[in-house]
Amino acid sequence: MKIKASELFSPEENKDIVDSIKKAETNTSGEVAIMVVDSSDSYREAETLGAFILSGFFSLILETVKAYLTALKAAGWGYGLSGFSAHFLSEAAANAAVWTYIPMVFVLYFPFRFLISKFPEMKIPFLSGNRIEETVRERAVMAFYEKQLYKTRDETGILIFISLLEHRVWILGDRGINAKIAPDFWGIIASELSSGIKEKQYGKSVCLAISKCGEELSRHFPKKSDDTNELADEVIL
């Protein structure tokens, strides 16, 4: 069963993450936040496309079998394997009927769509890589502003965004961060974190990513004497 965002970390791992963020922010004015979501979008078009393809495929199989059996019966052959014709496709094609195939597609479409909606991971094969990447990035940007992570004094907040369905990690820095740290650096950490999550090292890989973020932030944004903790340290859901 697919793990949910609310169940990704154990209570102990949640505590370790909070401690890791506090430690990472000890020597920097930068702020680290982490957010986990079940998915970045509902991907309704994948439900539609997937249901259409699957219903069409299975309807084709059923119609082909039905047409071939009709051909066997009309020719007076037996129904056993001994009666299997070498001209299977031609026999089936001659007896296939569009007027039964299309209604069958229509009837099967809705059960398949319901099935895909209940098991979101089935949507992934019907999505392009670009669609997934852009969606996760846009959801991360939206979350950054929805959760008001941009409201740090020196614009030094970063968001570690994890989208479980897509198996994607996106690290987003505020304007102050991006002025000094290249986005490629965050991409490397995101890739390492994604690999750790795939290996089911959830808490450990997140804590390691937070630590690396803190080290880089401390080099460019040393802690100020009047610095305060501006963002919550708990995992955002």
What are these regions, as identified by a protein language model?
Residues I3-K4, E166-Q201:
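Flexible, solvent-exposed short loops/turns enriched in glycine
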Residues L8-A33:
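Short, charged cytosolic
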Residues E31-V36, G157-S163, W170-L172:
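Soluble periplasmic/extracytoplasmic beta-strand elements of cell-envelope proteins
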Residues K66, T70, S90-I124:
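Transmembrane alpha-helices and immediately adjacent membrane-cytoplasm interface residues
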Residues L115-I158, G173-K180:
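Canonical alpha-helical transmembrane segment with a positive-inside/aromatic-interface signature
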Residues D184-L237:
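Cytosol-/stroma-facing membrane-proximal "stalk/adaptor" domains immediately downstream
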